[in-house]
Curated annotation (Swiss-Prot):
Organism: Shewanella baltica (strain OS223)
Subunit relationships: Monomer.
NCBIfam families referenced in this protein's UniProt entry, alphabetically: PRK05286.1-1, PRK05286.1-2, PRK05286.1-4, PRK05286.2-5, pyrD_sub2
Name of the molecule in the record: Dihydroorotate dehydrogenase (quinone)
Note describing how the cofactor binds: Binds 1 FMN per subunit.
Entry keywords, A to Z: Cell membrane, Flavoprotein, FMN, Membrane, Oxidoreductase, Pyrimidine biosynthesis
Positions bound to substrate: K66, N111, R112, M113, G114, F115, N172, N177, N246, T247
């Protein structure tokens, strides 16, 4: 009930202003009696992924809490894990406003945020300050002004800084809102990046006597051949996981709607089928050697079950969470337990 009232108010506001208000409010109320307004108890449904055991298979996707400011509040809602970021080595403002648009009739969102964040050092402070033991993945990217050819250096800088504070690290090369970033998904650039990241991971594991898994987040706008090539690169470089998928540049299912022609990545219900299709193809290519975290257009328990059936071991929600609220977490976990 509280979420429905809050949503009604926030949906009257500019989307980005509403987002900042929500994150700020959650930050203020976390670890206080006010968590009763959105907290809930969820029966555990443990799942093992990438050598880690999560209390349930539903996580918060990257992009919601970029700077890790409200981790404890999301823990109170019952998420099995929270993925913070995308974070870059240096703070950056992101793209020009406006850059976030609701497509309410389609339960979709278009964003062209451009990795706006306060930088990796700020994120690390927030990770150290969190009071709960929730599993936190850290999604890392490159700064906009870093040439693509030198992009791997940004990923290595972020890895070095977050390594001790992350349950796992997600490598984001699939956002459509950083010029040239998606080119890292192909050919020699992909292999060079994955190889450098794997080498760094093993160095850090030896240095800190702690192995932190690494997952690659991919786009939905890929051909079968491109998915096959990514799968082969993941296996070759012994990556621990894949996250499928990011937002899409297609506009299927939203034509004619207000804001549908805005540039950026489309998420939410219009992405559901495309994301599931990519997960299914990726699962075929990976042959069970690397687990998949499924994300993209999960608006109901049924959508989540379709991701599991396609080959995902765990799921993440973002747009569906905005439209449905915390109850979606419980609905998915309950459906998973009965599966």
């Amino acid at each position: 009930m509280f979420y429905k009232i809050a949503q009604k108010v926030m949906f009257q506001m500019d989307p980005e202003r509403a987002h900042h208000l929500a994150i700020g409010s959650l930050k203020m109320t976390a670890n206080s009696p006010l968590t009763c307004l959105y907290g809930q108890t969820i029966t555990p449904a443990p799942v093992s992924v990438m050598g880690l055991t999560f209390p349930n298979p539903v996580g918060l996707a990257a992009g919601m809490d970029k700077d890790g400011e409200s981790i404890d509040a999301f823990h109170a809602m019952g998420f099995g894990h929270v993925e913070v970021g995308t974070v870059t080595p240096r703070p950056q403002p992101g793209n020009d406003l406006p850059r976030l648009f609701r497509l309410k009739p389609a339960k979709g969102i278009i964003n062209r945020m451009g990795f706006n964040n306060k930088g990796v050092d700020n994120l690390v402070k927030n990770l150290i300050a969190k009071k709960t033991d929730i599993m936190v993945g850290v999604n890392i990217g490159k700064n906009k002004d870093t040439p693509v050819e030198q992009g791997k250096d940004d990923y290595l800088i972020c890895m070095d800084k977050v390594y001790l504070h992350a349950a796992y690290i997600a490598v984001n090369i699939s956002s459509p809102n950083t010029p040239g970033l998606r080119s890292l998904q192909y050919g020699d650039l992909l292999d060079e990046l994955l190889s450098a990241i794997k080498t760094k991971q093993l160095e850090l594991a030896e240095k800190h006597k702690k192995y932190v898994p690494i997952a690659l987040k991919i786009a939905p706008d890929l051909t079968i051949e491109e998915i096959e090539n990514i799968a082969q690169a993941l296996i070759k470089n012994k990556f621990d996981g894949a996250i499928a998928t990011n937002t899409t540049l297609t506009r299927d299912g939203v034509s004619g709607l207000a804001n549908a022609n805005e540039s950026g990545g489309l998420s939410g219900k219009p992405l559901t089928e495309l994301s599931t299709k990519v997960i299914k193809q990726l699962a075929i290519c990976l042959k069970g050697q690397i687990p998949i975290i499924g994300v993209g257009g999960i608006n109901s328990a049924e959508d989540a079950l379709a991701k599991f059936d396609a080959g995902a071991t765990m799921v993440q929600i973002y747009s569906g969470f905005i439209y449905q609220g915390p109850k979606l977490i419980k609905e998915i976990v309950n459906a998973y337990r009965l599966k």
